[in-house]
Structures are given as C-alpha cells and as structure tokens.
Curated annotation (Swiss-Prot):
It is found in: Cytoplasm. Coiled coil: none annotated. Strongly inhibited by sodium orthovanadate. Pfam families: DSPc, Rhodanese. Residues 1-47, 216-240 are annotated as: Disordered. Residues 244-387 form the Tyrosine-protein phosphatase domain. This is Dual specificity protein phosphatase 7. It comes from Homo sapiens (Human). The lineage of its organism: Eukaryota, Metazoa, Chordata, Craniata, Vertebrata. Substrate binds at residues 331-337. The gene is DUSP7. Belongs to the protein-tyrosine phosphatase family. Non-receptor class dual specificity subfamily. One of its GO terms (cellular component) is cytosol.
Length: 419
C-alpha cells in the first residue's frame, strides 16, 4: 500500500541549481541527454547559446566500463555527508567551507586547496590537465548561466577549471540520475563515515550541527545558491550514525534508506509503516502488502517546500501509532529531510518548541543536519502552532536568513490527539 504525495514543483533555477522538482519526477530525468565518447570531446553537451558543457550519464558509464575511469577525474560537489553515504566510484569530494566561497567567487582560491585528503590532492594536481574533469552535484540536468544570476558552486568550479585550461564538464542529471541508471558504479556506505569527527558549527539558532549553508551558501546569499554548496565550515558530520534506525518515541523510528530495505530490522522493531521522504528512492516492499507506505517527493534542496506535507506526514505517523505499529521515517542518509519531518511531529504532538524538539532528536541521533531552509520552515511551523522558543529572540535573524520557498507554508492544522 502506498500513498504518493504530490506537491507543486520546485521553482526552476537551472542557472544555479539542478535540484529535482517535487511531484515525484525522477531527479535528472531530463529529455535529450546525449552520449558520446572520447576524453576531450563535448559528447553529451547541452545545446544552445551559452550552455555549459556537460556529459551524459550514459557517456560516463561507457567510460567507466571501457577504461575503469583511467582517463577521468571525477569531482563530487555535494555536501560531505551525501558523499559519504554514496558516490560514484573514484570520485573526489570537494568540501568547500562557507567562508572560502567568497574567495572562490573572486577567483583567488586554488581548487587544490579545498581538497581535504592529501592523496586526492596529489591525484588532482597530476591529472587535472591530462584527464577529462567531470563535476557532478545532486541533480543538475540542463543548465544555462543567466547574466547577473548568482553562480552555483558547481558553476564556479567548472568555470575556474576551464579558465585554467582543463577539459571540464558537468554530469547531466547529476548523481541522482547516474545512481538510478548505473548503481553498479556507485559506492554506498550509509552507515558510517571514514572521516574524523569534528565539532559542529555554532548556528544562528544555537542548534549544534545545523547545516547553515548545506543547500545555500555562506551567510551572504543563502537564499540563492543551490545544494552543491557545503556545510558552513565544510566539515563532515560526526561519524556516530548507528547501523540501525534510532528510536525517537516508542513507536517512531528515524533512519536512512538502507534501514528501509532491511526486513530483519523492520521486523525487530515492529515497523509496518514507512514514510519515505525522497522523490526517487523506491519503496522496497510496496507490492508485498505487509507494509503501508507514504512517499513525500522532496529533494534536500533550498527551493523545496517540505512544510506543506507536515499535516499529512503527522497523520500518517499517528495512524501507525493508533494501530500499535512502528513507523520508520527515512530519507537518503537520515539526517535532513526525515529529521525535519520528525522534529515537526514532536513540535505538534508534544508541544515542544523548535529548539526543544531539535535537541530531543539530537540527543537520540547526534549527526542530524537539516538544511537551513528546512529549519526556516520549522520556525514558521512553530509560529503557526503558537509555541514559544528562545528563537523568538532572533526575529531579525529570521528576516535575514530564512526564506520559505512557496506561499503554501501556512496551513490549517489537523485536529490530532495529543500524545
């Protein structure tokens, strides 16, 4: 059994973003993605005046099959925690601290300096001019820079590499499209991170670990930059994510995509309801009749309005509770979208402020990291619920930093039985 939630599509910002639109459309499934071969050609490039050079997912698959990526230098421009969860084989992650974005825009930041791993840094230095350099973010499909529009991190890196004489392209459809079509060439490790833990940055709300600019930028232009930007300090989230879903309440579990496909885990915790907060991850046991599904088609991107789905998500979780079943709320890595829904549930059902609900979840799962604009939507939700919070002392900060992506962020609350 499955409930598919279909919301209004995300606003198109193809000059700065490749996020998949809401409404269930598969990320990166754009028409006309060409293919080709040859390390230095423009095979699969987008057409049209001013279009940025790209390669198709099919082209990359052929290169990996034929040469094992020997003639390629793959650069993953997504946030570190997404890279650790899953990435294309041989890829190097570019974790750009927010403060360095300004230097990158000014053109005085060597790309090599933002590669954290020494071996990867050397590999980049020796191969960037000889190999085809292919950059990818989460889901950029077709992209034409617009005069005066703010450049994405992907665009800044691509332009700098080409200015430096590199044969650089971006991957059409991004990681989402490639993983969907050629998952055999993706390395997945959603349970742990190989990077050392680091102290979370201090946020505007005082919420440790909040990704101030995961899907935005540094504080100056967080409304405009896309999901290819990194965390505010470029550091990885703590590597303490458990290899099983975390129990938030006796019936409510928070997890990742891998948890949703593990029958042993689902059976162990009595989970019969699964809330899938992604646009394209499949519901593994949908046709067996044993589980009840609801899918919220939202990407982890600044332009997405997750708050419009709060009432339905809360009702779904409560339905599981009323039937004395466990419910798993998951996204890809279990740190952003699913956390946002879980926090919203606690706020409404337990009358907790945003700070208190966030801290409640963080005590259970230390590596949570919702993107900044989802936090803005939770702040709107807090006001709608009439809850008090220390955040109320930061009214001016709300105006400066938060933007709800659509006009549908306010909604009549369902009459729900309190816990």
């Amino acid at each position: 059994m499955k409930n598919q939630l279909r919301g209004p599509p995300a606003r198109a910002h193809m000059s700065t973003s490749g996020a998949a639109a809401a409404g269930g459309t598969r990320a990166g499934s754009e028409p006309g993605a060409g293919s080709g071969s040859g390390a230095g050609t423009g095979a699969g490039a987008a057409t049209g005046a001013g279009a940025m050079p790209c390669k198709s997912a099919e082209w990359l698959q052929e290169e990996l099959e034929a040469r094992g990526g020997a003639s390629l230098l793959l650069l993953d421009c997504r946030p570190h925690e997404l890279f650790e969860s899953s990435h294309i084989e041989t890829a190097i992650n570019l974790a750009i601290p927010g403060l360095m974005l300004r230097r990158l825009r000014k053109g005085n930041l060597p790309i090599r300096s933002i590669i954290p791993n020494h071996a990867d840094k050397e590999r980049f230095a020796t191969r960037c001019k000889a190999a085809t350099v292919l950059l990818y973010d989460e889901a950029t499909a077709e992209w034409q820079p617009e005069p005066g529009a703010p450049a994405s991190v992907l665009g800044l890196l691509l332009q700098k590499l080409r200015d430096d004489g590199c044969q650089a392209y971006y991957l059409q459809g991004g990681f989402n499209k490639f993983q969907t079509e050629y998952s055999e060439h993706c390395e997945t490790n959603v349970d742990s991170s190989s990077s050392p833990s680091s102290s979370p940055p201090t946020s505007v709300l005082g919420l440790g670990g909040l990704r101030i600019s995961s899907d935005c930028s540094d504080g100056e232009s967080d409304r405009e930059l896309p999901s290819s930007a990194t965390e505010s300090d470029g550091s990885p989230v703590p590597s303490s994510q458990p290899a099983f879903p975390v129990q938030i309440l006796p019936y409510l579990y928070l997890g990742c995509a891998k948890d949703s496909t593990n029958l042993d885990v689902l059976g162990k915790y009595g989970i019969k309801y699964i809330l899938n907060v992604t646009p394209n991850l499949p519901n593994a046991f949908e046709h067996g009749g044993e589980f009840t599904y609801k899918q919220i088609p939202i990407s982890d991107h600044w332009s997405q309005n997750l708050s419009q789905f709060f009432p339905e998500a809360i009702s779904f979780i409560d339905e599981a509770r009323s039937k004395k079943c466990g419910v798993l709320v998951h996204c890809l890595a279990g740190i952003s979208r699913s956390v946002t829904v879980t926090v919203a549930y606690l706020m409404q059902k337990m009358n907790l402020s945003l700070n208190d609900a966030y801290d409640f979840v963080k005590r259970k799962k230390s590596n949570i990291s919702p993107n900044f604009n989802f936090m803005g939507q939770l702040l709107d939700f807090e006001r709608t619920l009439g809850l008090s919070s220390p955040c109320d002392n930061h009214a001016s900060s709300e105006q400066l930093y938060f933007s709800t992506p659509t006009n549908h962020n306010l909604f009549p609350l369902n009459t729900l039985e309190s816990t």
